[in-house]
Amino acid sequence: MYETNMYEGMIAETVTMQGANGDTINAYYARPLGTGPFPGMVLVHHAPGWDEWYRETTRKFAHHGYAAISHNLYHREGQGKSDDVAAKVRAAGGVPDAQVIGDTEGAAQWLRAQPWLNGKVGVVGTCSGGGHAFLFA
C-alpha cells in the first residue's frame, strides 16, 4: 500500500540481455533503490511494440517495490519509432512464438542473475503480450 512518507527513488535504464538463440537484445529495467531483495516482474509488450507505455509501466512496478524488466521483442528488426518498427514486424508476419518465449526466458534469467532479486519472478503482458505471457507461464 502506498504511504505518503515513502521514499520514491529508483534506478531505471536500458540494458542488453541474451534473448532467444543467444541473440543480444535490449530491455528496459527499473527497480527501487537499495539492496533489496525485490520480487521480479517481466513485462511482455503488445503488438504495437516496445513503446513509452511499457517504460512507464516498468517504472510503475518499481515504484511499488518490484524489479521489473521489459524486453524489446522487435530488437532484431532495427531501431526507430516504435510504430514504424511494429509496422515492419507486422508486414513480415510477426515474431514467432518460440522467439518471444525465448526472449521472455532471457529476461527472466537476467532478473534472476541480479543480486538484489529475491528469487521470485512473475510475468505480465497486454494485448498479444498477454497471450505470450500465458504461453510462457
Task: Tell me the role of every PLM-derived stretch.
Residues 114-126:
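Alpha/beta-hydrolase fold nucleophile elbow
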Residues 61, 136-137:
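Aromatic pocket-lining residues of Rossmann-like dinucleotide-binding sites
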Residues 125-129, 133:
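Gly/Ala-rich beta-loop-alpha elbow adjacent to hydrolase catalytic centers
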